[in-house]
Amino acid sequence: MEAEMLVSTVFPGQGSQVVGMGKDLSDNFTLAKQIFQEADDTLGYKLSDLMFNGPDKDLEDTSCSQPAIMAVSVACWKVLNEAMGDMKLKVQCSAGHSLGEYTSLVISGVISYSDGLRLVQERGRLMHDASVVRPGSMAAVIGLNEQEVETVCSQSGAEMANINSNDQIVISGDSEYVAEAVQIASDMGARKVITLPVSGAFHSSLMEYASDGLSKILDEIDFNDSEVPIIANSTGLPVKSADEIKEELLKGLCSCVQWKDSIQYMVNSGV
């Protein structure tokens, strides 16, 4: 009988890209090299060269960074599986932070790798276009709890974008609103408030411009029901049906990432 190891997976979101990403994997594992080659072939340009050599500015373009992060995440997962030999990794549940949610769908068999790459490339382009139409910014608030950050947002007009932990919350929205929120949070005693180096107000209502385009491409892709519970960013709760997953992806464009709740759900489930 084949031995199994029960695992749960979490995958990173945008902002984790860095020039040189994936190069060690490609140099040392044929499987990783094949995965990166498939990305190049699918997208029609040398994404792998951009990942390995940059420049930074081009890799930071959201339509490039999103498929790059997905490609490296998928390569890490598949190389790990291969390295386990006769020990099969059986996923109990999977979560991903924002973009990482799409990687969860690939490794869970909900969508194909090639469709996933095309989907996140288009998602990145749509998010960029939305940022041009409705510019905004984001900031990380460290040292205030969720209720306190809600007060900051109600007083400034900013929106909560990522609840990452009890005292690390990212806000998003119109740049003037976020700037005001930064000042209010500092006055309320936040340990640190950091304006993030991003090109738009992601996970806020300013991304609504991208919704129609994302809905269209979601309808063009084949989705399967998932055998593995996918922890939804917008609720921190599991979804499995194809329809639920597509609805979650569309909702996630403008809604807050409930990362703290996602991790807590996994812990409560015995992961």
What residues fall within each predicted segment?
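A short, well-structured juxtamembrane/interface segment
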Residues: 258-265
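Short loop/turn motifs at secondary-structure junctions
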Residues: 90, 189, 270-271
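Non-catalytic positions within long, well-ordered alpha-helices that form the structural scaffold/packing
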Residues: 186, 267-268
